[in-house]
Amino acid sequence: VALGACSPQPSEKKEPAPAAEGAGDPAASAATDTGADSADADNATAAAEQGLPATEGAQVNEWTSCPYLDSQWVADTNGQRLTTQGIDTRFDPPACVFWSYPDAPQITVIVRHMPSVEEARAVVDWAAPIDSTEPADFEGWTGGRGVFSDSSVYAVQKDDYAVAVWTNQQQTLKAELIAKEAISNLKL
């Protein structure tokens, strides 16, 4: 399955896009969380409505549960205990980031409602570059899946929606199951 909006890529193999920018240590990232008063919430909503670039990674700005994925289900699916989680409210619905014991996130989920089909495809091309991933598709959703040195990615697009999931496991099936659960729970 070819993605029509994917641009030609250099022949060198690329690693997937960063799952959660600056996500490293949840405690260190929490220093930037100011409690999100109503002005912060309004700004986050406005940014989501204005549209972030297709290449925008998740940056946790609120330490709370993911509104569309059950934390125990996520832990069971990825095969790792969940120690903390947070969301990035700049996205609508918010991006979800889950940690286990390592400093890096175990799972990052970004769901994008883009202004156009082409921009949704650009999200998938950024998350799962066509030259370093295999095709992925199900029920009208198309995109890519790939395994890298310390992670895997599953990213798909349908109409003007894109869903990208990164996991620290080297099995795309886990990322795929999480993406499908997010799609189902959000009724996309």
Regions found by a protein language model. Give the residues of each.
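Sec-dependent bacterial lipoprotein signal peptides
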Residues: 1-4
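Bacterial lipoprotein signal-peptidase II cleavage site
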Residues: 6-37
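Sequence contexts marking disulfide-bonded cysteines in secreted/extracellular proteins
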Residues: 7, 65-67, 95-97
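A short, solvent-exposed beta-edge/loop patch
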Residues: 10, 25, 37-62, 134-188
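Secreted/processed peptides and extracellular or luminal domains of membrane proteins
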Residues: 12-13, 71-72, 102
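Amphipathic alpha-helical segments
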Residues: 65-81
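Short, solvent-exposed recognition patches
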Residues: 76, 81-141
